[in-house]
From Swiss-Prot:
This is Putative MSV199 domain-containing protein 238R. Pfam families: DUF3627 (PF12299), MSV199 (PF10553). The lineage of its organism: Viruses, Varidnaviria, Bamfordvirae, Nucleocytoviricota, Megaviricetes. Residues 229-316 form a coiled coil. It comes from the Viruses. The keyword Coiled coil applies. Belongs to the IIV-6 006L/238R/313L/468L family. It comes from Invertebrate iridescent virus 6. Keywords: Coiled coil.
Length: 440
């Protein structure tokens, strides 16, 4: 207020706000405090821009297009839950929620801060946090914030273990002389402490980071709610199947009673026929002989029927096994599951998998082509109903051969197989769905 002048301060609009989480309430309080002091917030400042940051820290400077416009508000809860319930007859895992409702570029940036080893906080990271000015000013403001919030950090000198940090070695090469190297210190922090610090930021980019965690928290809650709904739906389906089975058993019981009554009637008629033949003077032995022949023929027919029923039971058992994980294909092509293996011009993870419905797979493929200049489709499979289970099988088999998996990304650099081996292995696992194995 003092910065802009009290005569320019007026109430433009009053709004009633509702918050669904403690984090949202804290963000609103911080924003009000910041507005009351300087009236210079992210809403009044067009400079609130995130860089398009890749997983590697050395790529943070390469792209500067806005990521803020790509961060969207989550759809209504009911819409997300309905979409998840209609997605598959098999229970989804939480990655489906993150893949469909989290901004993938921002997720790739946040994944850089995962792991266990300390990370060098250089000027690229500080600029991404929203700090301005030279490196010394950025570090001073950031360290002041860490001290205020009692967040652990460490400053390394050139005599300490700096070999583990390539970005520190690069900065040393840019220093003018040994004296500057001896006086310099480099800030490193553990990933957990960095995430705590990001939630305490009060910079132009802090809102985007905090909104990311708010969305993630909301999706975790939605996944828990989805799990409850899915279990209830399965119970209802099981109850309907049990009722149908009980009805079938009642019908079989009635049919058996009817057959027993018919057999009693047949025996009665046979007795009456025998008495009638005796009255007519017909030789009983002849009738008995003919009757035995008919009985033998009937028994042969019954044995054949038993053989046919046994074969039907075997076929039914194999059919039950074969359809256990094979749901019917959706009527609409855009709802059918696809599994794609891509090759990209990425040094660390040249191979990338997309596992989604056709409509979402096309969107994911377009995102990859936007991010990388050279994208080739090595494998495209229709993998209904569950591409997630298929991908788990692939990872279980190929990890034994040294293939490295990171979410949807794949590297065979240190493995025992070639690109052709990778494609053939995935096709072989896909073909196993046609094999029928008897359950023991």
């Amino acid at each position: 207020m003092a910065f802009n002048g009290i005569e320019r301060f007026y109430v433009k609009e009053l709004k009633k706000l509702e918050f669904s989480s403690i984090i949202e309430l804290q963000l609103a309080e911080e924003e009000l405090i910041r507005d009351f002091g300087t009236l210079n917030t992210i809403h009044n400042n067009d400079s609130g821009v995130f860089g398009n940051i890749d997983v590697q820290i050395t790529d943070l400077r390469k792209k500067k297009k806005k990521i803020m416009d790509k961060i969207y508000i989550l759809p209504p809860r009911k819409e997300i839950l309905d979409s998840a319930m209609n997605e598959s007859k098999i229970k989804l895992d939480i990655s489906w929620f993150f893949d469909n409702y989290m901004d993938q570029e921002l997720t790739n940036v946040m994944n850089y801060f995962d792991g266990e080893e300390p990370i060098h906080i250089n000027t690229v990271v500080l600029e991404w946090f929203g700090y301005e000015g030279d490196l010394r000013t950025q570090k001073r403001k950031f360290i002041d914030m860490l001290k205020r919030n009692s967040i652990p950090y460490k400053e390394l000198t050139s005599k300490e273990e700096i070999e583990l940090y390539p970005t520190i070695k690069e900065e040393i090469l840019s220093l003018p002389h040994k004296g500057a190297i001896a006086c310099s210190k480099w800030l490193v922090m553990k990933p957990y402490d960095i995430k705590i610090a990001m939630l305490r930021l009060n910079t132009k980019n802090s809102q985007i980071i905090k909104q990311y965690y708010i969305k993630m928290e909301e999706l975790v809650r939605l996944y828990a709610q989805y799990t409850t709904l899915f279990i209830e739906k399965e119970k209802e389906q099981m109850s309907r199947e049990m009722n149908s089975l009980q009805l079938m058993m009642e019908e079989m019981k009635i049919a058996n009673l009817k057959q027993e009554e018919e057999r009693k009637l047949d025996r009665l008629m046979l007795t009456e026929s025998r008495n009638m033949l005796q009255t007519m003077g017909i030789e009983i032995k002849t009738v008995k002989y003919n009757n035995n022949n008919l009985i033998d023929q009937n028994n042969e027919l019954l044995e054949r029927v038993d053989e046919v029923l046994h074969k039907v039971d075997v076929v039914q058992t194999k059919l039950n096994i074969s359809v256990e994980d094979r749901a019917p294909q959706p009527d609409k092509n855009k709802r059918r599951e696809r599994f794609l293996l891509l090759k990209r011009n990425d040094e660390n993870y040249p191979y990338y998998t997309i596992r989604a419905q056709d409509i979402n797979a096309k969107k994911a493929l377009k995102r990859q082509k936007d991010m990388f200049s050279d994208v080739t489709i090595l494998l495209d499979l229709i993998c209904h109903p569950n591409t997630k289970t298929f991908y788990v099988r692939i990872k279980d088999d190929l990890k034994k051969k040294g293939v490295e998996f990171h979410l949807c990304e794949i590297s065979i650099e240190d493995s025992q197989i070639t690109e052709q081996d990778l494609v053939e292995a995935m096709m072989k696992i896909n073909d196993e769905k046609r094999e029928i194995k008897n359950e023991k």
